[in-house]
UniProtKB/Swiss-Prot annotation, chains A, B, C, D, E, F, G:
This is Proteasome subunit alpha. Keywords: Cytoplasm, Proteasome. GO terms for biological process: proteasomal protein catabolic process; ubiquitin-dependent protein catabolic process. Belongs to the peptidase T1A family. GO terms for molecular function: threonine-type endopeptidase activity. It comes from Picrophilus torridus (strain ATCC 700027 / DSM 9790 / JCM 10055 / NBRC 100828 / KAW 2/3). The formation of the proteasomal ATPase PAN-20S proteasome complex, via the docking of the C-termini of PAN into the intersubunit pockets in the alpha-rings, triggers opening of the gate for substrate entry. Interconversion between the open-gate and close-gate conformations leads to a dynamic regulation of the 20S proteasome proteolysis activity.
Length: 234, 234, 234, 234, 234, 234, 234
């Protein structure tokens, strides 16, 4: 690291001379240390798949779950600082419920993602706080059909056919860039997602029992049981 | 970079000895990394045209849209930090709707642009925040006729016959400075805009399907379909 | 620049050992980069004249207007940071209208200028903000007769027979110091002002179509049309 | 320690270039100096066991108690800065009682732990405060059955079959990782916990009279008397 | 300047090791650059006299007036930063009027001076602001008789028989220290004051038309006309 | 002191790399300069004893009193910064009275001590303040029986059979660690306390007339008169 | 001054490694530059005596008065920064009157002194302010009898038989330590006080007309006239 850089990267609210926000870039490093996950659309729905790092047999498995339901038609998977992620997921749930209480219907998924991303953007512009060290994939169904977004520490959001976050993001993306086709069946999509994750995750044990959840048109989000997951592992 | 400069460019609220605000200049660097877009007036209306960077085939195209409608007679295109841009566009929409609710009619376009620019100026004068890393072109129709403004990170606004922002701004401007004529037809203006963008954008792929939107006297803003766009590409 | 100076000029709220406020002096440098303008009193009124920098033929001329009406008996011309100037002009207009709503009559011009100058002074005394990088000439008519003030980044105001701001301030002042006489006719005053501006402005193009506005006893402020301006240019 | 590190670890709200929050890591060092404690689930309940450092015979033993009841179905044991721990335990009790007053029933244990952890997370993201220098084990019974969580200075929470905090955490965890079996009886679990603590605590005196508390299905939390504890010590 | 000093003089709220407040001392330097003025008591009243710096014939003379009426029995003359002085004079006028509205009578002069001085003292004790760069002489009549005070950037006030502020303060004071007698007539006092000012002011032009104002028992404050002033100039 | 330390010990809200809070440790140094005092329980009550430093015969003795009644069943003795101690004792008295007003009965002593300690803990966690430079011994009677606590600058509290604070704390504690027996009579306890203090206090004069106060079951706190004290001094 | 010290003495809210608050110590230096004053009790009352520095014959003597009445049974004399002293004396007067309005009787003198001292203590503990650079002697009569306190920049208060502040404090105290006897008559006490002051004040002129005020049982505070003072000067 050069001296010039150090002068700009310790104060969140300043630009470097070439227009970069170092603190946001460093927060992305925290995400790059996180577990790998992906979202993938199929013909009539969208699935989330995440590796599951079993650090110790003493940890309850439910405690390792990376996929979180926001409501019964939207789920999210996160990578990065665990506590930051929890706070943002709760923020999403509360925003969603407030909308329901106020307007009688749940939020459009894009608006829900924007609400979370706006919160994250503010932490990159105001002094006295640090950015959130987290990326989030949101997946779900709304009146437009299956939706799949990611949101990064800068508060930037994009919509995808498939998308990955975490340590193995680059390998997963390279795999899907090559293999992904539209109009996959749910089955094909999940098998492709698992193959993509396997190509990226060095630690085999964390792919022994990955997490899977999906939603299909006309249904609610379904988190796969161990039995359902195991069908996809050979 | 000289030591003298470093002393002044890390604290947003101070002037340098020669009266410059370095943080604002650095925010402009963030804009210079953004995608290139332009606005161009024609006889009875105004058009916006933007390159569309397709970074990956896995990204949904709607997610790359740079042109945003504020309401049915005003649209904007942005360049720079994507999350900052979203926040400012939402700010514009909310200001616009509040005016409508309060006074029963939409804001004059110039006032709408000033409202956004005042917000941006404040972030260059108060401590504890950074400037917005974004430039915006606003185009639309009001009682005066077709209007076309830009607004930069300093909060400066100008009205133009044609204007460009983003990485290719200088080349586009040089092209239009030479070629632009008043009283172009809509067709001529769009063809000239595309030619100008092509002269500036190195990556050919991002001009494969540029975004186009325009508004004509007596009509509302129209975002071109792929078919409509493709008519202009040869 | 000496090391001793650097220790004091980066924090707005401190005096240097010799009792100077460097940030205010640096803000004046921003004004010295601005376009040149002047105000000049004549027998029964007062006029404002400004060079008009036409940076590009693509910019709408109305967008370059430096002379702004506050209400129909007061106008202002500014030099320095464009966004700061807009914010202060709006501040003046709102103060003026609030007075009218509250007391049924417009503010005395001197009080209006003081209101703006007090705002500017506060930004030189409180931490967490920078001074406004702008000087303003206010001209108008009130019960005392024609009035002509300037206000600088320190918030200092003075009343003048004629006054100049911007890059050419020193030359314009030297010219008028020598030539100005009281009881000029409006015509004579405007011709003298244009001559003074021409003596100061290096870039001839920006004197091709200067801005002129004036007010006479019993009338309201009049912004000159291109035809009216052109009468004075030979 | 390298110079590069020192630049980032004195300001809580910034990330280091590799995405770490040094202040949170240093707060964990405060925890590593604390007394060793553990939580362990058994067939129909969960137990907490803590060493008891008797620094002086002049201290009242009740004052050394590390195990604290939140209400009659949840208890906690802490390690790290003693005053920080007291403040957080009180925070948990008040949150719990507010829930009871508001909704007529006590909080779900997981929600109670999240409430505390959210408080701890905020102290890692906002300026002007330091993180809490404390880790907490929460144990209890709710409608799901026996629950066992820990919460660290980052605000991260996990659910466990057994878990340890404090100076001897690594040795205790290694011991339990090897020995722990599910469906232990309460008796077996407590004996295993004491053996694990003994393997980790160098100062024998602090294992002379360890603290033990447990809860079984259908009962409330029971803090062991000296007599009950002594049964387990040979 | 020594390094030891620099460590203490850039932060207003700290004492130096020898108990000094450097920022207050530096603010006094700003006063030492101001125009010279004095107050002088005579048998049945008190007068204020100030040099009048005519920087340019283009400035309106009223704009150079240093003597300001607070109400018809109190006047003030200031030296130092012009905008700071205006803000404090307005503060005095508003305090005075508020008292009148609240209690039906104007403030005792000493209380009025204290109100201003308390304001100035606060700016020497709180962070985030700088001291006022101004000294003020207040003169007037109240139930005690003629009163004459000064107030400096520290917020210190004293009552005098005669007193001076500004660049020539030391010479004027030395002159009056030697010459002043009690029970002068108004005429004698004004002549002595002008002589004292002349002994201190290097630039003769600024003594061509000094400002004079005085108040006598049973009368209100009177600002001298040019004719009245000229009687005293030979 | 090493450079590494200096980097962490000037900002209260940060941990050092080894998990220490230097500002709290430095505040304890202020306590180590204070006068020595102790609390000691006996069979049916508790006593406080303090040396009394007579710095000058011109000081009123009442002004030197270190033992303060909170109410008639609780007293406290402090060591460290005198003004900080007064503020905290007043805080304890007000908390105590508020409880009485609100609930009709005085606070449980443990809760009273916690209220004060929580206040002290907050000053170790928030920016912009320093910790209190004081340790306090609280002694009294409540429904549990005689109580004896200390509270240090970290906000840590412990309950004791006997405890000491101030410059001689280590010697007093060593003495009592060796000599203290439970079920002492009040007389024996006070004699032992005085002997312990004498073993620790170098300046004999400050043990000429120590302060003593005690409370017995069924009675209120009694501050010993000079005559009562003198009985114990040979 | 050593480098180690400089690291701690520029930020008010931190302790130095040896538990000192440098800013408070530096504020005491400001007091040591102040005029010398003393308070002295006699048989049935208490007196205040202060040197009177006559810097110039042009200053009104009333303006130099150091002894201030708080109400008719309490007076104070200050040393240090004059503006700080005025603010604190006004604070005392207002606290006193508020008590009277609220409870129908004036404050107990000790409580009045504590109110002022608490204010001073806060300015030693919170960031963004500096301590008051002032020491105050309060003297008066209340139901206990004659009272005499001092209060220093740390907010520490003590009660005395006699006490001194300002530049000559050490010599005055040494003198009185040797000479003071209880049950002096008012006359003896004042003569002793003047002798003590004379022993300490180098500049004879400031002892030409010292200030004296006293209060006796059953009477109100009496400020001595010049004639009364002169009786004590030979």
């Amino acid at each position: 690291m050069q001296q010039g850089q150090m002068a700009y990267d310790r104060a969140i609210t300043v630009f470097s001379p070439d227009g970069r926000l170092f603190q946001v870039e460093y927060a992305r490093e925290a995400v790059k240390k996180g577990s790998t996950a992906l979202g993938i659309k199929f013909k009539d729905g969208v699935a989330l798949i995440s590796e599951k790092k079993v650090r110790s047999r003493l940890v309850e498995k439910t405690s390792l779950e990376k996929i979180q339901l926001i409501d019964d038609r939207v789920a999210a998977v996160t990578s990065g600082l665990v506590a930051d992620a929890r706070v943002l997921i709760d923020f999403a749930r509360i925003s969603d419920q407030q909308e329901k209480v106020t307007y009688g219907s749940l939020m459009n998924i894009e608006n829900l993602v924007k609400r979370v991303a706006d919160q994250m953007q503010q932490y990159t512009q105001y002094g006295g706080v640090r950015p959130y060290g987290v990326s989030i994939i949101f997946a779900g169904l709304d009146s437009i059909g299956p939706r799949l977004f990611d949101c990064d520490p800068a508060g930037t959001i994009n919509e995808y056919k498939c998308v990955s976050i975490g340590a193995g993001k680059d390998q997963v993306t390279a795999y899907l860039e090559k293999e992904y086709k539209e109009n996959l069946s749910e089955d094909e999509a999940i098998r492709m997602g698992i193959a993509a994750l396997k190509s990226a995750v060095a630690d085999e044990s964390s792919m022994k029992e990955p997490e899977i959840a999906s939603i299909k048109m006309g249904e609610t989000f379904h988190v796969f049981t161990s039995e359902e997951v195991s069908k996809y592992l050979n």
